[in-house]
Amino acid sequence: MSGEQTPMCSMDLPEVKVKTSMAGRCRVFWYEQYVQPCIVELVGSALFIFIGCLSVIENSPNTGLLQPALAHGLALGLIIATLGNISGGHFNPAVSLAVTVIGGLKTMLLIPYWISQLFGGLIGAALAKVVSPEERFWNASGAAFAIVQEQEQVAEALGIEIILTMLLVLAVCMGAVNEKTMGPLAPFSIGFSVIVDILAGGSISGACMNPARAFGPAVMAGYWDFHWIYWLGPLLAGLFVGLLIRLLIGDEKTRLILKSR
C-alpha cells in the first residue's frame, strides 16, 4: 500500500511550478522593460556629464571650444554604442521627449527617464567637482552655463539652443529610431552632431542641448542665471523634431498622415 500512496501535494506540484515560472518571467520582463533602462539612463548620463564637465573645468585657453567639443561628442558616441541597446541611449530629456512623440518610447517611461537623467547629471557633476582642483572648478563656474550674462543675449541664446538641439535630436531619431534611415553608424553620427554643435554655437549659448547637462553643474556650483534657457530651448527642439518626424519625414510606420493603409 505504501508504494501506491501519492503525497497529497503532488497533484499541485506542476501548477506550482508553472505559477513560479510565470512569476519569475514576469519579474524579469518588468525589470528589463522598465527598471533596467532607467538604471542605464542614470549611469550613462552620469558618465557623459562627468566627462563633459571635466573637459570644461580642465580646459585651457589654447584649446578653446575644441577640447569640450571632442570630449562631449566622443563620450556620448561611446556611451551610446555601449549602452544604447538597453535603454535607447538617450541621456537627454529633449531626446526622450522627441522619441516619445514619434512612438519610440512608451509614454509611461518618459518621466522615469527624465528623473534618471537628472539624477545622473547630479552624480556626474558631483564627481567632476570632487576630482577637480577647487580653483579650477570655480574659475569654470563648475562647468555650469554662464555665458549668457545680459538680457540682450537671451533671444539669440534661446534660438541657437533650439537649432543646435534640433540637429542633435534629428541625428538620434533618424539614425537610431526611424526604421527607414536607422543604421549602425548612429552612435558616431550622434556624437559627431554634438561636436559640430559645440564648435558652431558654443560661444553664443554654450551649446548645452541637454537639460540634464545644465542641471547637474548648476546645482553643484549654485549658478542659476538664465538657467531656464537650457530647459526651454532643448525641450522645444525635441518637441519640434518629434512632430516633424511624426507628421512629415518619418517612415510610413512612424507618420500619422499620408499612409498607404
Curated annotation (Swiss-Prot):
GO terms for cellular component: apical plasma membrane; basolateral plasma membrane; brush border membrane; intracellular canaliculus; intracellular vesicle; mitochondrial inner membrane; mitochondrial membrane; mitochondrion. It is found in: Cell membrane; Mitochondrion inner membrane; Apical cell membrane; Basolateral cell membrane. The modification Cysteine sulfenic acid (-SOH) is found at C53. The modification Cysteine persulfide is found at C53. A motif (NPA 2) lies at residues 210-212. The chain crosses the membrane at residues 37-57, 85-105, 108-128, 157-177, 184-204, 229-249. It catalyses: H2O(in) = H2O(out); urea(in) = urea(out); NH4(+)(in) = NH4(+)(out); H2O2(out) = H2O2(in). Sulfenylation at Cys-53(C53-SOH) when hydrogen peroxide flows through the AQP8 channel, making it susceptible to hydrogen sulfide produced by CBS. Disulfide bonds: none annotated. It is a multi-pass membrane protein. Keywords: Cell membrane, Endoplasmic reticulum, Glycoprotein, Membrane, Mitochondrion, Mitochondrion inner membrane, Oxidation, Repeat, Transmembrane, Transmembrane helix, Transport. GO terms for molecular function: ammonium channel activity; methylammonium channel activity; urea channel activity; water channel activity. The keyword Cell wall biogenesis/degradation does not apply. Residues 1-36, 106-107, 178-183, 250-261 are cytoplasmic. Induction: Down-regulated by fasting. Glycans are attached at N139. It comes from the Eukaryota. Expressed in placenta. Highly expressed in the epithelial layer of gall-bladders. Expressed in heart, kidney, submandibular gland, liver, small intestine, colon, testes, and epididymis. In testes, expressed in spermatogenic cells. PROSITE patterns: MIP. Disruption phenotype: Homozygous mice for AQP8 have normal appearance, survival, and growth. Homozygous mice female for AQP8 exhibit increased fertility and numbers of oocytes in ovulation. Homozygous male mice show an unaffected fertility. Homozygous pregnant mice have a significantly higher number of embryos and fetal/neonatal weight is also significantly greater. Exhibit a greater amount of amniotic fluid and placental weight is significantly larger. Aquaporins contain two tandem repeats each containing three membrane-spanning domains and a pore-forming loop with the signature motif Asn-Pro-Ala (NPA). Belongs to the MIP/aquaporin (TC 1.A.8) family. Channel that allows the facilitated permeation of water and uncharged molecules, such as hydrogen peroxide and the neutral form of ammonia (NH3), through cellular membranes such as plasma membrane, inner mitochondrial membrane and endoplasmic reticulum membrane of several tissues. The transport of ammonia neutral form induces a parallel transport of proton, at alkaline pH when the concentration of ammonia is high. However, it is unclear whether the transport of proton takes place via the aquaporin or via an endogenous pathway. This is Aquaporin-8. It comes from Mus musculus. The gene is Aqp8.
